[in-house]
Amino acid sequence: MNTKNSKTKLLWLIPLVLGTIYIIRREQQTPYNSIEGLIFGTVYHVTYQYDGDLKPEIEKAFKTFDGSLSTFNDTSAISKINQNKEVVPDSFFLNVYNRSMEISKETDGAFDITVAPLVNARGIGIKENQQGDSLTIDSLLQITGYEKISLAQGKIIKKDARIMLDCSAIAKGYASDVIAGVLQRHGVKNFMVEI
């Protein structure tokens, strides 16, 4: 009886081992693809292991995201909001906005998406080579503060038209998550997204 049980185990073990070897070899033979481009005024790199070409789908997702949250894109939703133009934010913008507001409340304003005027005054954002002095910074603080913006009927309401949003502290990570989602929908397990 013991010999029969051993043979049965062996019959199950052989296909299991062969299957595992096949899967490992196949994965090692799958090529890595790499693409790069520009988003948010910087470079992105995406490397992924997949038999097909996902470049068009990845670039489409980046383009959609850039059209929503890039302050470096004059036609993006966030740029239009900063220019006080009428815009209905898309789901990318709303997800980042809602999460930003949660974090702002949790940190008592230490995290704040209304910092664009301060970022620009230091030459970090869309306006380069400006070094705001302390008087300029103090005056800009009057038009910052997450509590000075709200969402009503799907639109951003600003208490002061000079308020500007900058979601880059969250947007780059969220864009990476969106691209990871694109890759995972295709069954890609090995990848790296860098922005």
Model-based region annotation:
Residues 195:
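Short glycine/proline-centered loop/turn elements that form peptide/ligand docking sites
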Residues 2-168, 181-192:
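A contiguous, well-ordered beta/alpha segment that forms the leading edge of an enzyme domain
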